[in-house]
Amino acid sequence: MKLEAENDLMAVRLEKLHQLQEAGIEPYGGPFEVTHSTTAIRERFDELEGQEVALAGRLLAIRSHGKASFADLQDREGRLQLYIRLDNVGPGIYELFQKLDIGDIVGVRGKVFRTHRGEISVEVRQLTLLCKSLRPLPEKWHGLKDVDLRYRQRYLDLIVNPEVKQVFITRARIIRAIRSFLDNRGFLEVETPTMHPIAGGAAARPFITHHNALDIDLYLRIALELHLKRLLVGGLEKVYEMGRIFRNEGISTKHNPEFTMLELYQAYADYYVMMDLLEEMVAYVAREALGTTVVTYQGDRLDLTPPWPRLTMLEAIKKYYGVDFDQLPTAEDARRAAISLGLEIEPGMERGKIINEVFEATVEPHLIQPTFILDYPVAISPLAKRKKENPDFTYRFEAFIAGRELANAFSELNDPIDQRRRFEAQMAERAAGDEEAHMMDEDFLQALEYGMPPAGGMGIGIDRLVMVLTDSPSIRDVILFPTMRPKEE
């Protein structure tokens, strides 16, 4: 019934389109010179009252009253009321206006005034049809409520839900602020390949494509890391890249197969430098994008002001779970502790992996305020440098906000012999069925053998940062066109 009603409305609009064309009116016009936005007219009303302005946008409401009518026009910044009188525009333009529908795009010229009810408006003197809309907007001006439809047809979401548009405006401010922060600190923005002969830099399942001319399979990148480290070898001491990453994995409120990652690397630094850099950058970005370092996310008040608390992984487990893994030196000891928590631990799992399983189950949900978790097990950190005092752990941290990982950073492993051993261990896990284990990357190892300076490196999930700063519960709310299951016919 809904589809039939929509088809009926489209038929009416098509008939209006034909009438306009027969009358010699172009329904899909050309350029229109805009002098002011709706926001500028509101903010500068005292200056503009009585002055002629030109603005363009989409009609979201039409109220006809005989020889005078009102309409609401929405442009990129907001809405403004239009007032159209037959006496002002003449019968030709007024007849055109009466053939318009909600959703049509128009350009108008007229004088700024305030109605008797106090509404800032434009008294239209000229009107140009710029685009005839053939489909009716959903639920008129009451908003698009179907969440699935919002994601599939984001253009409609942006039209009828102004708060959604604001999320993506804020996202652009966040990305601009990140670039400004890094550029001002001497980092060089670079671009590295999206298609890789070997998938590496993260534990993830890649997408595979085929290059016809070379007749080889290639992988869409799952990380930026290994190419950026090659640039450290080449002498570019402070580099960053912000780009799309592709991981052939599940979809959830926290995960989209295609997402935006920032990775940066600084020669002669370590993970302590990366901690300082991250907390300074997040606070800077929040101030630039929002004007504050205190935000609310899903009811929680988050203070992004540095310094952030720092705990080792073992300290965090002891704090939130009450178990001291320093007193559980063997994998079997760790396994029993994990099983007592109700976790399913595979036979033969390494102690470091068990510790991480316990951490994810017992600690992560508690990390609401910005927190650094330091010193991850070497078993899950194949690209991070080992701690000298405890080689079972690495100089690696993850930063958490609102119970979710925001960033991952290392003191980078630059020992090519140790790196080869790590890759060999990963290959053994891959042979045992772990599809997310690292592949052997001989070209990267060769680069390390020329010598890479000690460095700190970091990866930051841009979408998750935007989620926090815009109070968005799902990653789909901050990606313009998220990945969706094909629509059933």
From Swiss-Prot:
<dbReference type="InterPro" id="IPR044136">
    <property type="entry name" value="Lys-tRNA-ligase_II_N"/>
</dbReference>
<comment type="subunit">
    <text>Homodimer.</text>
</comment>
<keyword id="KW-0460">Magnesium</keyword>
<feature type="binding site">
    <location>
        <position position="405"/>
    </location>
    <ligand>
        <name>Mg(2+) 1</name>
    </ligand>
</feature>
<dbReference type="Pfam" id="PF01336">
    <property type="entry name" value="tRNA_anti-codon"/>
</dbReference>
<dbReference type="InterPro" id="IPR034762">
    <property type="entry name" value="Lys-tRNA-ligase_II_bac/euk"/>
</dbReference>
<dbReference type="InterPro" id="IPR004364">
    <property type="entry name" value="Aa-tRNA-synt_II"/>
</dbReference>
<feature type="binding site">
    <location>
        <position position="405"/>
    </location>
    <ligand>
        <name>Mg(2+) 2</name>
    </ligand>
</feature>
<keyword id="KW-0067">ATP-binding</keyword>
<dbReference type="GO" id="GO:0140096">
    <property type="term" value="F:catalytic activity, acting on a protein"/>
</dbReference>
<dbReference type="GO" id="GO:0006430">
    <property type="term" value="P:lysyl-tRNA aminoacylation"/>
</dbReference>
<keyword id="KW-0963">Cytoplasm</keyword>
<keyword id="KW-0479">Metal-binding</keyword>
<dbReference type="InterPro" id="IPR012340">
    <property type="entry name" value="NA-bd_OB-fold"/>
</dbReference>
<keyword id="KW-0030">Aminoacyl-tRNA synthetase</keyword>
<dbReference type="Pfam" id="PF00152">
    <property type="entry name" value="tRNA-synt_2"/>
</dbReference>
<dbReference type="GO" id="GO:0000049">
    <property type="term" value="F:tRNA binding"/>
</dbReference>
<dbReference type="GO" id="GO:0005524">
    <property type="term" value="F:ATP binding"/>
</dbReference>
<dbReference type="InterPro" id="IPR006195">
    <property type="entry name" value="aa-tRNA-synth_II"/>
</dbReference>
<protein>
    <recommendedName>
        <fullName>Lysine--tRNA ligase</fullName>
        <ecNumber>6.1.1.6</ecNumber>
    </recommendedName>
</protein>
<dbReference type="InterPro" id="IPR004365">
    <property type="entry name" value="NA-bd_OB_tRNA"/>
</dbReference>
<dbReference type="GO" id="GO:0016740">
    <property type="term" value="F:transferase activity"/>
</dbReference>
<dbReference type="InterPro" id="IPR045864">
    <property type="entry name" value="aa-tRNA-synth_II/BPL/LPL"/>
</dbReference>
<dbReference type="GO" id="GO:0000287">
    <property type="term" value="F:magnesium ion binding"/>
</dbReference>
<dbReference type="InterPro" id="IPR002313">
    <property type="entry name" value="Lys-tRNA-ligase_II"/>
</dbReference>
<dbReference type="GO" id="GO:0004824">
    <property type="term" value="F:lysine-tRNA ligase activity"/>
</dbReference>
<comment type="similarity">
    <text>Belongs to the class-II aminoacyl-tRNA synthetase family.</text>
</comment>
<keyword id="KW-0547">Nucleotide-binding</keyword>
<keyword id="KW-0436">Ligase</keyword>
<dbReference type="InterPro" id="IPR018149">
    <property type="entry name" value="Lys-tRNA-synth_II_C"/>
</dbReference>
<keyword id="KW-0648">Protein biosynthesis</keyword>
<dbReference type="GO" id="GO:0005829">
    <property type="term" value="C:cytosol"/>
</dbReference>
<feature type="binding site">
    <location>
        <position position="398"/>
    </location>
    <ligand>
        <name>Mg(2+) 1</name>
    </ligand>
</feature>
